[in-house]
């Protein structure tokens, strides 16, 4: 489980601490 920011797979944590989809 090496997710950036600990978000759901396919999502990335933004600067404001939210998880947004990368697709």
Swiss-Prot record:
It comes from Spodoptera exigua. Hemolymph. Belongs to the GBP/PSP1/paralytic peptide family. One of its GO terms (cellular component) is extracellular space. The lineage of its organism: Eukaryota, Metazoa, Ecdysozoa, Arthropoda, Hexapoda. This is Paralytic peptide 3. InterPro entries: GBP_PSP. Transmembrane segments: none annotated. Causes rapid, rigid paralysis when injected into Lepidopteran larvae. The physiological role may be to reduce hemolymph loss following injury and promote wound healing.
